[in-house]
Every structure is written in structure tokens, then in C-alpha cells.
Swiss-Prot record:
Protein name: Mitogen-activated protein kinase kinase kinase A
Keywords: ATP-binding, Kinase, Magnesium, Membrane, Metal-binding, Nucleotide-binding, Repeat, Serine/threonine-protein kinase, Sporulation, Transferase, Transmembrane, Transmembrane helix, Ubl conjugation, WD repeat
Enzyme class, spelled out: transferase
Every Protein kinase domain range: 170-429
One record GO biological process: sorocarp development
Spans of repeat WD: 607-646, 690-733, 736-778, 780-825, 828-865, 872-909, 912-942
Record field: compositional bias (Low complexity): 441-486, 500-512
Gene that produces this protein: mkkA
Amino acid sequence: MSWLNNPSQNFVDPFIRIKCILGDDIRIIKFNSNISYGGLMNQLEQDFQCPISIHQYEDYEGDKVTVKSKDDIMEALTMYFELKALNPTKIISTKFFLKQLPPQSQPLSSSLSPTQSLILNNNNNNNNNNNNNNNNNNNNNNNNIIQHTDFPSLIINEHEELISNHNIKWQKGQILGRGGYGSVYLGLNKDTGELFAVKQLEIVDINSDPKLKNMILSFSKEIEVMRSLRHDNIVRYLGTSLDQSFLSVFLEYIPGGSISSLLGKFGAFSENVIKVYTKQILQGLSFLHANSIIHRDIKGANILIDTKGIVKLSDFGCSKSFSGIVSQFKSMQGTPYWMAPEVIKQTGHGRSSDIWSLGCVIVEMATAQPPWSNITELAAVMYHIASSNSIPNIPSHMSQEAFDFLNLCFKRDPKERPDANQLLKHPFIMNLDDNIQLPTISPTTTLSTNTTNTTATTTTTNNATNSNINQQQQQQQQQPPTRTQRVSISAGSSNNKRYTPPISTSTSSSSSSILNNFSINIILPINLIILIFREIKPNFVNTLSRVCKHWKQIIDDDELWNKYCSDRLINKSKFEESITWKSNYIKIYKQQKVWFHNKLNHSTLKGHDKGVFCVKLIDDQGMVLSGGEDKKLKVWDISGNHHHNHHSGIVGSISKKSGLNIINNNNSNNSNSSSNSSSSNSRYLFSLKGHSGCIKSVDYQRQSGSDVSRVFTASADFTCKIFSLKTKKTLFTYTNHQEAVTCINYLGDVENKCITSSLDKTIQLWDAETGSCLSTLRGHTGGIYCVKTDQVATHGNGYNHLVVSASVDKTSNVWDTRSSSKVRSFTQHTEDVLCCYVFDQKVVTGSCDGTIKLWDIGTGKTISTFIPSETRQKNYVWTVQFDQSKIISSGKTGIIRIWDIYNERDSRSIGGHHETIFSLQFNNQKLITGSLDKLVKIWSID
């Protein structure tokens, strides 16, 4: 987070946030303090994708001021930044009221054309860019690349290989892993047959994406550290290249995986294996320390093992070069479970911090658990390491030599810890069994400059990629029960949540009880308090407030909660603006806890003859609608009160058919635990018939009261139908589509319209009373699987005229139904986009590429990418829904996944269906699913 970048000073936000209003299109845009008028207009036109002018602005007193010249606008900006200078911690915001200009018109005279590249770097970066342009003025292509990517000058200026035009002859193989901004592939050198790993990072505008900027800066740091390192126990870098589409990083391919992944496969290691690996880790650390480099993130996930048992240190994104006195480094880098006390307390650290982390890795290898695994709260772990005099538990089964070795590594005073060379002479390392031979290491080879056309352009490559490859491989092979996070104060945070070593919950201690055992008068560094605050949970607040005198003020500071929530992309609902940010987060956390941990009961509705393609839950009415391949829409009563006529005559006319009322109730905490029993809490009511093809989608309309009056269906027979639930007859058939209709949405009684998507590549808006087509949206080049409206707008102030579609053409489009025009296109999926869902100006899409992407309507930028573990089998994501606390998805595997939307992880997996799930919907504390296995399941939370 930017507010943690300088822990010794108060947070100073260099931006102001301006609410820009163009008709019904409202966006909050951040502007840098040194932006010019031309840059301002350029940024506005790029965001709104049309020529505009600023008509009015709102001053600090809330009055609207009419703009007469560009000087008025710049004077307003100056005023806002002066206000911010007076109160640096206050978030200053205002409003710009915009007007759209005709295409040939231009806003008030601008110094920049809309097509020029706008670079908003600080003065140092600007100077660096100028120097770089002077050095490369003979290469126009290179300059174009720099303007196109706007990468940090650290990469462009210090690593000239990034703008080389040499071709790299390699063939892309199987995908090894995916991340939010790129994919990792196995590569084959087409000339030599050499295998290597390649991470391709798609080029986007990093100025608007701080997460990507941190990733690229981490890459640059690794390249800088590793460009001259060559050692048998350090991952070998092959090179880096940059073109106009991708940043490609080439590195040694390690097929064995990391220590953490091996622990997940084989369990704890024997002491002999630990000795073999520890000796090689020490050899790598000795080389690094001799070359004035501290790794700062030694842990099992960053130590790779090849097929011959050779250890390779990887992931140098947290590393630091030093010279002379090394205690000057006071920033917090690494993963807390493996951190030395001086790192967490930020009292200065050096090579000895790597030695402490090595001891933690030995404990990890001996137990298959991270150190401090008996403490469940990450914040409590950090406090425990910093404030107590204890050391990690040493496994009792280890030898006396191992005990002595670990006690040396775990000296609380870093000055008392031996260095790597001294530990290599310790009996624990020297006294290997006579019949044990260390792995034979072949000589290290380097790339010669005359082979740059066939391999990589230089010998510098990004090591973070190698760690990402192996961590993403581990993610497919193990179940992570807790969260491991890399944290950084001095240079922003860089999160790594992909691997969490298994821990035993039976030995877990209460974080509150651990903290309460410590003195409450200890005063911790304010930077540590802020860092712990980032990991805080609401049920932990009261305990932390007793830790030291700073906490009461911090916990009640809603501005800090605002920054905390903003960093996690947590928003407040516009209908609940009066609640505090603290209350907002606690509310979301409670919602997550219910879905992530509470017991699940489920019932099974049997009666469909073929697969179920659509379901709809009407929870307050105790009703379920389901349709599918058998061409019938079935209506179910799940209220359990079958004698109370609350469905306006529907229950009174039940068609009692045998074989349609088979209900199984199961209790489930996870995908593996369930028990079966029979019940009659739910039953089939009747079917709505009339379609000649399978029913693909269903929606409904309520009467003026609360009962459901009309049902809307979309079918593969090219038609849509409106049914009356009271008479069970067709009221109207819509026939304007030319191919199968895939999705239907009723837009509410105010609009009284329906919007439908079809494989005929169109979206149609039509009147639900007359059936007349009001507008047709065209722009997709393939069939459309899904169309959705913003559920916050639909359930709040009404339909907001924006819809989102998912198509066979691999894109998801945002449409304005008033102008029948495409507003934005999301193109980050690599295969068909099968489903989408819209909530509070954000969209979740699921694809045949096996990924789920959360993205923002206003910018079209990816916020997060969620990757089910079965992605390697290319299992399609057919259905997805989300709200402010979670994402729920499913698809080809029949497994339902509940995702933590803010930590990008799978928090719960539910089994129950044996084939593809095509539809799901959740509402309050119920979830309903429909599957190709002919079953409809209803999941309810205790």
C-alpha cells in the first residue's frame, strides 16, 4: 500500500480523486499533482473513450463553478492540492461535470493530443527516461516500446536487453501456471532442444495498476541482483526480452518442485535428507553473503529441488545488496512465519536474518509444517516473534547435533548467530552417514553473446518467475489450510498467497490467549502496529487493543480503515454510506465467515428426465424454478409448509405425480463429509410446457405484493416465452432471435422490459407487454452465452442501462442500451467466455480457459484472477455469481468453489454433483445448483 511506503513519516497521498460525471457515466479518477492541462484532458478522454470538455467543477464549499477557460480548471486543481498540502492525511475529492464533444471538436486548447503517451513519473523517472531516449535515439522501434509500455525507468535504463529486437526462437509448450497478469509456459529452444520456463507478462498501463507496477519492480530487483551471479545452488537465469505485447522472462526449468511441494507429497523428511538439503542451502547462502546479498525470504517454497536432489535457491524479489554495515536495512521483507525477530521489529538486520530463516526451514522439513504452526493468527505470530523470547519448537525426534545447530540459528541476538561458512563446519552438516553421497553437480554453463538469436538476449532473467512456477504447481497439488503472506513496508506490499504449508489444527492455540500471556505495557514500533493492522480480523480487535497504548487510537480511526479497505478493493454500498468503514468491513467479514466455515445442509430435487441448464431460487417464497434439456420448466415448493396456501393458488393446484418428489437431505461441511437421510420438506408442484427445445435460462416477475406472477424463459428453439404462474399458460412468445436464446433477464416493473442474448451474436431489448423489439446490440463476432445487468442497480435505484455480455469470441462486452453501443470490451480471456455476473460496477467472468476474472467496468482492468486447481484438465467455468464478500463458481467438474474475493484463494470446495454444473444462484444463506446429472440441489447454511 502506498501509505506504508515511508513508515517513518505520515502518509502523504500524491493524488487527488475527482468524481467525473458524463451523463449517467460516473467515475472516480486519480490525478497526479504534477499533471498538466493537456495530460488531464488526455486522461479523461482515454477513460471515457470520447472527446469531452469540462463544463463545471465543484469547489471546496460544494458550489458549482462554470468553466470558461483552461486557467479555471488549473486554478481549481491548484486549490485542491494546496488543501491537501495543509492536511496531507486527508483524502481530497471533488467533482468535474463533463460534456461530450462532436468528434471533430476539441476541448480547450491542449498541449497534448489525445493519442500522445502521457507519462506521470516523478522528476527522477523523467530524467531517466530522457537519458534512455538519448541513448537509444537511433532506434525508433525501441522508443515506441518505451512509450507503449511506460515501464519503470529502472528496467528500461539498467536492462537494455528489454528493448532488444533480437528474435528468440522458441516453441511454447504446456502451461505450468497462471497468475493475475500472465502465464508461465514450458519452453523449447527450437535450435538446441533445451527446455526452459517462460513467464509471459502482458503489457498494460502500469500507472493505473499499482499491483502490476510492484510486480515489475520486483522483477527488476531480481534482475539487478542476479545478473552477475553464477552458482550451482542458485537458479540459473537465461534472459529477458520485451516486445510490444509481452515481457518474457526465461529461466532454468526445475521439474522437481520446491521443498514445500515435496513435503506436501511425501510428508516430513528424514534427518539425513534434511542434512543433504541444508548443506546445499548453506553453500548457496555463503555465496550470496560473500557477494554482499541478503536473500530475506528463505522458506521452503523458495528452495527448489531438481530430479537429482540438487538444491536451487530462487525468488530474489525481496533480496538486498549491501556493503559495509548491514544493520542499516530496516524495511520488512519476507514471509512472517520464517522472519527473524529483528526483521519484524525493524531494528536493522543483515546476513544473520537468513540464518534464522534457514533454521525455520529445517523445522519445516522435519515437521511438514511452518514454524509457529500452533498459532493460527498471522498477526499473533508476528507479535509473538517480536515481543517474546521464545524460539520455534524444535522437533523432539531430532538428534542432539540438530538441536545444537538449530539453537545456534535461533539466537535472539543476531550478533550471536554464526554465519553460513561457520555452520558448514558444524557436526550436524559434517557428520553425514558414510553411505550418503551428496548429489553430483554438473559444471555451470553460461550463455555466450553469439547465441542471443536462438536463446535469450542476455544472461539476466527474472527469478520471481521460477518461484511463481513452482508455487503455482504446488497450488494444484496440495490443500492450503492457512494463509501465508509476504509483507513489505518500505517498498509497498507484494503478496504471495499461493502456498501455505499444512498445519495441524489439533495443536493450534488461541491467538488471543497467546497475546494475553504477554505484558500489555510493551510498546511496539508504530510500523509493526500498522502492519499487524493489515492482517487484523474483527474478532481480534479487542485483544490487540490491550497490546499497547497505540491500539485504541488506531482501531477507532475510520480513515485508517478506509485506507485498509481501499487496499483490499473493499467498497461500501452506496445504499449504506452512513456506516463507518470499520463497521462495513466487520459486516463483510461476518458474511465471509458464514459461507467459508458454517455447516452446510443440502437437499436434492429429483424429477428432470435430462440435464438441468437453469435454476432460479425465490427464497422468500420458498420456491425453486428449474429448466433444462427435457423442455420443461419445473416449479418446486421448498418451504416445507405444504398446507399453507401462500403461493396465490399455486399450491392448491399441485399436479401430484409419482416419482417427482424424491428428496435427499445431506449435511456437508466440505466436499468429503456428508450423511444421507430422507425428508419431505420439498416437493414438485407442476411444469410449464410449450418449448420445443431445451430451456437455457429463466427469470421471474413479482406482483405488486410479493408473490411471483410471471415467469420468463429462453430456449434453444430460438424463442422466449412469458408464462402465468396462476394459469400455467403461455402469455406471449418472442420470436425475433435467429438462433438459440441463451439468457433472459427481466429488468423490473419500472422498465417492464426483457433483455436476451443468443447464439445469433445479438443482444435484444424488448417490451415485456407488447413483445416489440426496442433495440438490438451488435458487435460480438461469435455467439453470446450470457447477458447480465448490475444487480446492485437492479435491486437499488433501478436498471442503470448498462449490460454485460459473454461470448464465444473470447470477449466480454459492456453495453449502453440507450445508445445501443458498446462501451467497453474485456479481452483478457484466451478462450470462449461462458458466463458473467455484474455487481456494483464490477464483473466476474468464467471461461473455457479455466480461469475466473474479476474486473472493473469503469477501466476494463483485471482486478483479480482465480484459478481452480483442475485448470490443467481445461475444465470449463460454466456458471459464476458474486457479491461483496465472495465469488461462487462451478463448471465441468461438478465441484462448487467459494472464493475469498479479497485474498484470491479458494476458501471452500463442495462436492455433490457428478457431472457439469451449468447453473447456480445464491441468495441470503441458500445456494441452488443445476447439473447435467439431472439433479437440482439446494444448499443451506446452519
